[in-house]
Amino acid sequence: MTKITNDLFLRAARKEQVDKIPVWYMRQAGRSQPEYRKLKEKYSLFEITHQPEICAYVTKLPVDQYGVDAAILYKDIMTPLPGMGIDVEIKSGIGPVIHNPIRTFQDVDKLSIFKPEIEVPYVLDTIKLLADDMLEVPLIGFAGAPFTLASYMIEGGPSKNYHLTKSFMYREPEVWSILMEKLGRMTATYLIAQINAGASAVQLFDSWVGALSRADYTKYIRPVIEMIVREVKAVHPTTPIIMQAVGASHLLEEWETMPLDVVGVDWRETLTGARKKVPSKAIQGNLDPSTLLAPEKCLEEAERIIQEGILKPGYIFNLGHGVFPEVQPEMLKKLTNYIHDRSEILLKKG
C-alpha cells in the first residue's frame, strides 16, 4: 500500500493540531474538468465507474491538478442500487431515473440483499488500485444515506419537495421501517467493504434529509443512521465517518450524540454556530459553491471562513454542496492555494 505522506485531512478529522487547513471539494472529480468531459464523450458515468483504471484516473485528477488533501472516490450514490434490483439510469440533464420505483410492500420485499464483492467488485478494485499504487493522500469512500436513496427510489427520480417519499413514510410506517432496514444494511456493508479495500475515511451523503423536520428525523431516520455508524465503527473503530447533508442545520444536534467524527455544514450555518451544536465533532464546509463563479466574492468568503476555521482544531475546508460544471479548474487550484497559504500564515501567528 502507498504510504500516505499528506495526512492533514485525517489529523483534522481527529481534531488534532495542523499547520494549515486541509482542503477537498465535493464533486472535485468530474464534470468541471476538461479531461473528464473528454472521457464522457466516449463513456457514460456507469461505464467509467466499471473500469477501475479509468475511474482511478478520474479520482486522482484533482489531487494532481488542485493540490487537495484528500481524494474522494469517483462514483455515484446510485452505484449499489442495481445490486438490490433497482433499475436505475443516469440521464443527462436530469439525474438518476428509477424505472421500477418503490411504491408498495411487495416492491420493498423484492429488494435483494446487497453483497459488495459480487455486485460492485469494480468499486473495490478501484479503491485497491488507488490505495496500493496511486495516492499519497487519504481516499474517501462514500455512500448515499437511506433517506436520500429512498427518495429517488420512491419518487422515481429527482424531486423538489419529496411528497411521495414523505407521504409513504407517514402512511406506511412499518413498510418504511423495513425499507430503512434494508437500505441501512446495504449502506453499512458497502462502507465497510470500501474501508476493507483501502479507503481511509467514509462519507454518508444525505443530500435531501434537510427536507424533514427534526421530529420526523428522530422518529423515521435516526435509528437507521445510528445502526449504520454503529456497524461500521464495530469493524473499523478508528476510521473517520463524515455526515454530509444540505439545508440540515436543524439536525446538527442529532449528529452530536452519534459516534460520527466529522459533520459537514453548508453556507446556511456558520462554523461558529455549528461548533456550538456539535462541539465534539470536527467540522467540514461551508463555502457556497456558487461563489466559485464569482472569484472576488469567493476569496472574500474564503477569508471569512479561514478566520473562523482556525479558531479551534478540527476543521476541513470544503463546499456546502458539489462543484458546478461551469467552475473553472484554475479557480479551484487558486482557492486551494489560498486556503493553504493563508491558513498557514495565520496558524503560525497563533
From Swiss-Prot:
Role summary: Catalyzes the decarboxylation of four acetate groups of uroporphyrinogen-III to yield coproporphyrinogen-III.
Site (Transition state stabilizer): 76
NCBIfam families in UniProt: hemE (TIGR01464)
Pathway(s) this gene product operates in, as recorded in its UniProt entry: Porphyrin-containing compound metabolism; protoporphyrin-IX biosynthesis; coproporphyrinogen-III from 5-aminolevulinate: step 4/4
Entry binding sites for substrate: 27-31, 46, 76, 152, 207, 321
Source organism phylogeny: Bacteria, Bacillati, Bacillota, Bacilli, Bacillales
Subunit structure and binding partners: Homodimer.
Protein name, UniProt field: Uroporphyrinogen decarboxylase
Major subcellular site: cytoplasm
Matches recorded under InterPro entries: UROD/MetE-like_sf (IPR038071), Uroporphyrinogen_deCO2ase_HemE (IPR006361), Uroporphyrinogen_deCOase (IPR000257)
EC number: 4.1.1.37
GO (cellular component) term, any one: cytosol
Keywords: Cytoplasm, Decarboxylase, Lyase, Porphyrin biosynthesis
Keyword Cytoplasm assigned: yes
Species assigned in the record: Listeria welshimeri serovar 6b (strain ATCC 35897 / DSM 20650 / CCUG 15529 / CIP 8149 / NCTC 11857 / SLCC 5334 / V8)
Disulfide bridge partners, by residue number: none
